[in-house]
Amino acid sequence: MTTSLAHIAGRTVLGAVLALALLSGVDSGTRATASSVPAPLAHAPKREQQATTIDPQLASRSTARVATDPGPYEYGWPVKPFLAQHPVRGFFGDPRIGNHGRSRQFHFGIDISAPNGTAVYATQTGRIWIHPLHPTTVAVVGRDGTEFSYWHVVPTVRTGDHAVAYETVIGRIEAPYGHVHFAEARNGRYLNPLRRGALGPFVDDTTPWIARLTAESGGRLLLQSSALRSGFDLVAEVDDETPLAIPRPWHDLPVTPALTRWRLVAAHGRVVLGWTTVADFRETIPSASDYDRVWAPGTTQNHVRSPGHFRLVLARGLELRAGEYVVEVAVRDTRGNHAASRFPLAVG
């Protein structure tokens, strides 16, 4: 690779993220806030379908599951065995909130669970770069500029070393994290490692979930004691399950669906608002400035014994004529498992 390490340091997405963390006062190192050391998302027990502002007795739901993943894959897993699926406790796009709520961002990789001390391998051949102020984050930059970064890893390599895919141990998982945050970036954009054809094998037969739909105003819940007035926000709380069991204490925790869409139809079936994408993490993530557009107030990430709430903004200040409507919400993961729910909505 002919590019100098100084040039790599200036151009890598990892370098940009760490530089931003330094400028914003958020520590991205081994004792960083949740925005850079993401705590996996906690999961409440399976709930019955409910809707706070939409009558739960009238809500309906449909699901479909896909349990195969034929490949091929661009790369295997960064921990042994390379061609066997490992538990993933944090998904791409999950909300990450740190620095006492002042730092909010989308999770830009996946969290692969493994015991502390587990050897982590390079998933591509390339040059090593380690940020001097954050020595437990290792990047491997390939000849084409593709960057794989590994967070919460005690390095066994140095900046400038040459890494060989699935031969070079770049480090070992640092205690007490019990996972490696694994990220992929190309052309300045983070990509979802769980997209089709990327990391494999990855089989997912779990179905995403629409927990509830609420109508709100100024962050306040509007109760269904009477018909809603126009000019309210619609918020959907969604989640998904991890396909493999996660070790304690991060067991049975939710993750974010890869795709969420919605539409509005009149009670007699006329489409009022067509299908609109709220969040699409299947390939990449929105810019950081879109966080508050995507995630509603009250969204929280998971902590041990403290379930997170993933609240997506469907619409803000929705203006509708008086009448009866149906809100349809659909969620999907990267493997095609999907669910849809219909919620009645009365506007006075």
Q: Predicted segments — roles?
A:
Residues 3-14:
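Bacterial N-terminal signal peptides that target proteins for export
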Residues 20-44:
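C-terminal region of N-terminal signal peptides and the immediate post-cleavage residues
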Residues 38-137, 158, 165-166, 175-180, ...:
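Surface-exposed, glycine-biased beta-strand/turn segments
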Residues 118, 144-147, 189-190, 270, ...:
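Short acidic/polar mixed-charge low-complexity motifs
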Residues 121-122, 142-169:
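Short histidine-centered loop motifs in beta-beta connectors
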Residues 147-149, 176, 251-321:
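Exoplasmic/lumenal beta-rich domain surfaces
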Residues 337-348:
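Short beta-strand elements
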